[in-house]
Amino acid sequence: MLRVGRDSIDFLDHYDVVVVGGGHSGCEAALAAARLGCNTLMLTLNLDKIAWQPCNPAVGGPAKSQLVHEIDALGGEMGKVTDRTYLQKRVLNRSRGPAVWALRAQTDKREYARVMRSVVENQPNLTIREGTVTDLVLGRNDEVVGVVTHFGTIFGCRAVILTTGTFLGGRIWIGRHWQAAGRAGEFAVEGLTDTLRQLGFETGRLKTGTPARVDRRSVDFSVMERQPGDPDVRWFSFDPEVWVPREQMDCYLTRTTPETHRIIRENLHETPVYGGWVEAKGPRYCPSIEDKIVRFADKESHQIFIEPEGRDLPELYIQGFSTGMPEKIQIQMLRSLPGLERCVMLRPAYAVEYDYLPATQLYPTLMTKKVQGLFCAGQINGTTGYEEAAAQGLIAGINAARLVQGKPLVTLPRESSYIGTLIDDLCTKELREPYRMLTSRSEYRLILRSDNADQRLTPLGREWGLIDDRRWALFQAKQARIAAEIERLETQRVKAHDLAGIQLSQLTGQGIKGSATLAEILRRNQIHYSDLLELGLGDAELDPFEQEAAEIAVKYSGYIQRQQSQIEQVSKQYHRPLPPDLDYHSIPTLSKESRDKLSAVRPLTVGQAARIGGVNPADINALLIYLEVRQRQRAADPVCSSL
């Protein structure tokens, strides 16, 4: 670690912001900082692997699609690139309520990376360069002022964003054999973890993995279940300019067999985890196939999805089949699956372990508590998934730019967005396994839907400087049309004896007493906006997404209002700030565990304190009483300093 005033430092060049890493988090961070006017440098190990999808070439899914919609609503890029490069799109959970609808896109991995690279290469204020950052430069006040590459090149800056993915101390495993690498064929980053430890950061190890890739020409699809895309394509971006209708490709479904399970059980000792060579925790919600066989021993079979990696690629991704087995056993496992009896493996599966920083060492702005100007985003914070990484990168990029420009840093409350929920969880909970976003993690999922992400967040994106005039005009016009339609539905009435009233009564099996508004009718379970259109009672000039938004707002208005009231009640206490210098050990009514946890995490609000593991509701009540007493004593005696 270099220090200004102690070491001789020869800066090659100076930037406002340096982003370390060119993955999904790094791209969003670099684009945000550059678009906000900062002279930005993105350093990445390999320019040809910018925005690479090393595991599943897919974007979205439960909770993840909400993140992508929110990234787009704030002015990020992931949704736009996905809409331009998808191979297939499907809405998951469509039979359930809109709170859990999840758009998922299979993407062309090479095209996705190529399009995103073109975006970053052509972004004003953004320079991209190959380089491996192994050290930091600190200023006289322990603030970050630069980075050092493996070959000794030093770049000066006022903010650094670490988006190191799985490369920080990365090690990939196939059976008993390992290699220092962040991904197959790419070097690991050594040295940076040591610098972070010297600065007092706690670090840990996590594990993830990726399945084998097989040659599509060696696969028999006729014995598998076809999984086509949805005919009515939906979009991640709220900007119609990037909507590109494309021919869709099929995915396929097969299943494990008793032979698959036998091979795995007999060879568990050959895997890095069960063999005892890797102790790092893997992702609970994306387990290896051997973990599934062990944890769900009573299940006779597991679903395996066969997914294309590109239009012009012969490679198929075997979703749900990641493993750390030796290659010879991997081939046996693959050939035990129906349709893959004669498959040719092009790339073996492998496990990867890497260093991370528990994110309780960060503020919700994603700046570290120990070093001014140092931000972390993505897998270095303990998350798994492209979408989680991109969301963090966007917020880190915004805040790095605001720090450089002398503006107050910004946060998203957990009740405002899935991004806010994600970051709040990371910064307050002691996570010892890779974190994946789930709809169940949000207490407010009825309000935090995909369809209204722009309504919730685009005004913030505009305020922060990432939504341009064209997007803002589109947003305002759309919201005006939806609001006008909701008002029309709430006021236009249908009489019981009218033809439309009779037809609606027949459709729902419920009569109309005198008359009813269209909104009252739309709230009936059997009625949808499409029914109103068929009867000439809808607005055909609205696009389908505006019609859907109006229907959801009307149909679920009672539930939405109740949840909004809950948020307002909780916010009164949970948004109450906590003094940064509060001595928790001096509060005798707190349990010892909560005093230790609160002192370690240093939450900024009562709400954050309540979500720390080991801090129970009784502790929060004791803390609120203490704050109330402290406030009264200080009001009575302004010079009181005893508390």
Curated annotation (Swiss-Prot):
Cofactor: FAD
Encoding gene, per UniProt annotation: mnmG
Protein name: tRNA uridine 5-carboxymethylaminomethyl modification enzyme MnmG
Entry's localization field: Cytoplasm
Protein purpose: NAD-binding protein involved in the addition of a carboxymethylaminomethyl (cmnm) group at the wobble position (U34) of certain tRNAs, forming tRNA-cmnm(5)s(2)U34.
A Pfam family assignment: GIDA
Coiled-coil regions, chain positions: none
GO biological process, one term: tRNA methylation
Source organism per UniProt: Synechococcus sp. (strain JA-2-3B'a(2-13)) (Cyanobacteria bacterium Yellowstone B-Prime)
Molecular-function GO term, any one: flavin adenine dinucleotide binding
SUPFAM superfamilies the UniProt entry points to: FAD/NAD(P)-binding domain
Entry keyword annotation includes Amino-acid biosynthesis: no
Positions contributing to NAD(+) binding: 282-296
Top-level lineage group: Bacteria
Gene Ontology cellular component annotations, sorted alphabetically: cytoplasm
The entry's keywords: Cytoplasm, FAD, Flavoprotein, NAD, tRNA processing
Subunit-structure text: Homodimer. Heterotetramer of two MnmE and two MnmG subunits.
Family, as annotated: Belongs to the MnmG family.
Binding-site positions, FAD: 21-26
